[in-house]
From Swiss-Prot:
Function: Binds to sigma F and blocks its ability to form an RNA polymerase holoenzyme (E-sigma F). Phosphorylates SpoIIAA on a serine residue. This phosphorylation may enable SpoIIAA to act as an anti-anti-sigma factor that counteracts SpoIIAB and thus releases sigma F from inhibition.
GO molecular function: ATP binding; protein serine kinase activity; protein serine/threonine kinase activity; sigma factor antagonist activity
Name by which UniProt lists this protein: Anti-sigma F factor
GO biological process: asexual sporulation; negative regulation of sporulation resulting in formation of a cellular spore; sporulation resulting in formation of a cellular spore
Keywords: ATP-binding, Kinase, Nucleotide-binding, Serine/threonine-protein kinase, Sporulation, Transferase
Length: 146
């Protein structure tokens, strides 16, 4: 069965936990393992934080958009902003790379996403924003909704 959810919120750091919990609650209907749920929550947190901190540089007027699609035992996540975009995507995907060392950012966001998800696609254009598409195949999915 296919099920979808869309969520849009202001680019405020306090909304990161709201996004993480909302996505986890929606995905729970597939009965993921605790590890799978934790990995998805972590990835949502990383992507949303990137949008807020890097995409909008802390500008609360920006919006973060999340789309979640559940299709049988597969979770598809899209996290998008219309912020600054990424000028060098290859460099940004390198472990420990950060544009904000003064904020003590670890530069591991994309690395974490790539390790926890089955597929990660990033589209970004300077001054146009960034879209991250993530796919996760759940191991013991027993969809609870009919």
């Amino acid at each position: 069965m296919r099920n979808e959810m869309n969520l849009t919120f202001s680019a405020l750091s306090q909304n990161e936990s709201f996004a993480r919990v909302t996505v986890a609650a929606f995905i729970a209907q597939l009965d993921p393992t605790l590890d799978e749920l934790t990995e998805i929550k972590t990835v949502v947190s990383e992507a949303v934080t990137n949008s807020i901190i890097h995409g909008y540089d802390g500008n609360p007027d920006g919006k973060v958009h999340i789309e979640v699609t559940l299709d049988d035992h597969v979770v598809y996540l899209t996290i998008r902003d219309e912020g600054m975009g990424i000028t060098d995507l290859e460099e940004a995907r390198q472990p420990l790379f950060t544009t904000k060392p003064d904020l003590e950012r670890s530069g591991m966001g994309f690395t974490i996403m790539e390790n926890f998800m089955d597929d990660v696609m990033i589209d970004s254009s300077p001054e146009m924003g960034t879209t991250i598409r993530l796919t996760k195949h759940l191991s013991k999915s027993k969809a609870l909704c009919n």
